[in-house]
């Protein structure tokens, strides 16, 4: 039986309206109170702003990601008291203050192995031997570090980095020397510790000087003209790269107790710039009585000039997928070493009547044995004070090199130069590090070209700068040499030469010699407190770590014999 409208109205509760009761029994100091938790979600009872056709067929996770409540009370991701918006809320969003820790898509590189043995450096003789620079076969070179890796599908410029992507070992590389099982690990030093070392040293003083230098040809400072590019010509001159303990001058200075630590500028700069290094290397340290000699092995990685060592996407080896044999690290290092050797010989004016002679003749050149004339090279043996306040004097003697001399345009005085060359292989190839086209940009955008080289070759340029400062050179000349054809590494052209004061260039690179002196003194002290013998300082091939090993008697003889044997095999071929 249907009820009448009057009966329904009569059944309604008494009061002014309908709904929940106005009063509540829960009060706090007379104020109505509703218990709550900050963890409770305060969402909307119903959302009428979205359409009914929601693309949500991804299961529970898809639903929670797309349609969960916008705010958790007390979470701090939005305003504490959210006032209702009078306008449409669909276009409103809150910027998240939570750091995004999502990993990137791309990987970190591949495996790197060393190439075949080749003819590269100075063979060990009684006086050290001279460098035989050959362009034939690829040299054995322990290198190939990629600080970035490659994009699988991004192509050129497609690199992206994730959280702590910089801190991962990029490639599995071979060490520059085989660590034997009977070698004792004495110290392990992280690069972070090396970067905190500091020791102020003096400007140094000249102990003795040998050799001679020719005058620099200033015509190379002029920008090259496209129609008249200067070719890099191979010039055979007798150049030497004698290790420390085989240097007859250093042997005499050691007998006179001139210093405690002895080294060459190449070895010393490698140690002082160790925190910037990426490729593996090793230094042999000989401790005899109260003296320490920093030496290098024959055909060591220190003899080679690296290319784009610090580039984000460094050159790849064949084992890493590189099909460009002339752009692999070992081939590029051999090419760069060849360029530097010939570039220094070409940019000087060989005039016997105008050369600048040092106090003594070249200590390594023997006219009866050599068929080529000696290269323009002056050897200065300089002494530095590495003492601290709470001990006796500790001196270091280093053999430095100067390549040329020029007249100061203002006062006409002689300025000594160190001459080096940067080389461009192919700015569009893998491993170029985003380098600009030197032919079109070197004149108009010189600063950008140099800045890119500072980024891609930070370690190499730092070593050259340190060598110039150690030699007390007035100017560091950097040549820019490019391939005549990017697909061939046989012919090169000189595009220009730029000169800097070494200390100004060091400031641009944020290079501090006090840190380098601290590293040298620390490593020397580690060896001075130990027994006489041989030690090897090894740069880890995959980590930013230096390791100091104690080598038993005869432990390095086998390594040196193997190197000489390989050299003889190459000569026979």
Swiss-Prot record:
**Source organism of the structure:** Pyricularia oryzae (strain 70-15 / ATCC MYA-4617 / FGSC 8958) (Rice blast fungus)
Q: Name one GO biological process term.
A: cap-dependent translational initiation
Could you tell me which residues belong to the region RNA gate? 301-315
The domain of life for this entry's organism is: Eukaryota
Q: Where is the signal peptide?
A: none
Q: What does this protein do?
A: mRNA cap-binding component of the eukaryotic translation initiation factor 3 (eIF-3) complex, which is involved in protein synthesis of a specialized repertoire of mRNAs and, together with other initiation factors, stimulates binding of mRNA and methionyl-tRNAi to the 40S ribosome. The eIF-3 complex specifically targets and initiates translation of a subset of mRNAs involved in cell proliferation. In the eIF-3 complex, eif3d specifically recognizes and binds the 7-methylguanosine cap of a subset of mRNAs.
Stretches for region Disordered? 111-162, 552-573
State its location(s): Cytoplasm
Q: Does the keyword Nuclease apply?
A: no
Q: Where is the composition biased (Acidic residues)?
A: 556-573
List the top taxonomic levels of the source: Eukaryota, Fungi, Dikarya, Ascomycota, Pezizomycotina
Per the record, the major location class is: cytoplasm
Protein known as: Eukaryotic translation initiation factor 3 subunit D
Swiss-Prot/TrEMBL keywords? Cytoplasm, Initiation factor, Protein biosynthesis, RNA-binding
């Amino acid at each position: 039986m249907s009820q009448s409208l009057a009966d329904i109205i009569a059944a309604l509760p008494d009061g002014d309206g309908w709904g929940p009761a106005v009063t509540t029994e829960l009060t706090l100091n007379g104020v109505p109170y509703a218990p709550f938790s900050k963890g409770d979600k305060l969402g909307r009872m119903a959302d009428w702003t979205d359409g009914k056709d929601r693309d949500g067929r991804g299961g529970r996770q898809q639903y929670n990601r797309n349609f969960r409540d916008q705010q958790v009370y007390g979470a701090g991701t939005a305003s504490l008291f959210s006032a209702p918006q009078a306008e449409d809320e669909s276009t409103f969003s809150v910027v998240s203050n939570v750091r995004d820790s999502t990993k990137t898509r791309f990987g970190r590189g591949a495996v790197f192995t060393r190439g075949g043995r080749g003819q590269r450096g100075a063979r060990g003789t009684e006086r050290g031997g001279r460098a035989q620079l050959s362009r034939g076969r690829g040299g054995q070179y322990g290198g190939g570090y990629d600080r970035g890796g490659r994009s699988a599908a991004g192509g050129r410029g497609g690199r992206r980095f994730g959280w702590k992507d910089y801190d991962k070992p990029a490639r599995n590389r071979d060490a520059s020397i085989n660590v034997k099982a009977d070698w004792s690990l004495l110290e392990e030093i992280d690069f972070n510790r090396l970067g905190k070392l500091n020791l102020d040293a003096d400007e140094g003083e000249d102990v003795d000087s040998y050799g001679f230098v020719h005058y620099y040809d200033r015509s190379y400072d002029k920008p090259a003209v496209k129609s008249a590019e200067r070719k890099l010509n191979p010039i055979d001159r007798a150049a030497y790269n004698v290790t420390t303990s085989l240097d007859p001058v250093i042997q005499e200075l050691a007998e006179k107790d001139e210093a405690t630590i002895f080294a060459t500028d190449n070895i010393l700069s490698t140690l002082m710039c160790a925190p910037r290094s990426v490729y593996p290397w090793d230094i042999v340290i000989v401790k005899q009585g109260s003296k320490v000699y920093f030496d290098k092995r024959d055909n060591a990685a220190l003899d080679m000039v690296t290319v784009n060592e610090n580039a984000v996407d460094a050159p790849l080896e064949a084992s890493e997928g590189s099909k460009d044999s002339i752009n692999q690290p070992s081939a590029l290092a051999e090419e760069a070493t060849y360029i530097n050797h010939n570039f220094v010989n070409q940019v000087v004016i060989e005039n016997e009547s105008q050369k600048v002679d040092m106090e003594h003749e070249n200590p390594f050149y023997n006219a009866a044995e050599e068929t080529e004339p000696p290269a323009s090279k002056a050897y200065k043996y300089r002494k530095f004070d590495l003492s601290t306040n709470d001990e006796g004097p500790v001196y270091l003697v280093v053999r430095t090199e100067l390549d040329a001399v020029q007249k100061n345009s203002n006062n006409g005085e002689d300025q000594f130069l160190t001459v080096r060359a940067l080389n461009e292989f192919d700015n569009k190839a893998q491993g170029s590090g985003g380098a600009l086209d030197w032919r079109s940009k070197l004149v108009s955008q010189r600063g950008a070209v140099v800045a890119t080289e500072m980024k891609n070759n930070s370690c190499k340029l730092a070593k050259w700068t340190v060598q110039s400062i150690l030699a007390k050179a007035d100017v560091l000349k950097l040549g820019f040499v490019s391939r005549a054809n990017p697909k061939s590494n046989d012919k090169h052209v000189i595009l220009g030469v730029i000169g800097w004061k070494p200390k100004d260039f060091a400031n641009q690179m944020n290079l501090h010699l006090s840190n380098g002196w601290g590293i040298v003194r620390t490593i020397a002290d580690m060896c001075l407190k130990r027994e006489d013998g041989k030690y090897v300082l090894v740069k880890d091939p995959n980590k930013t770590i230096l390791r100091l090993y104690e080598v038993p008697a005869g432990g390095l003889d086998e390594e040196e014999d193997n190197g000489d044997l390989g050299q003889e095999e190459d000569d026979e071929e």
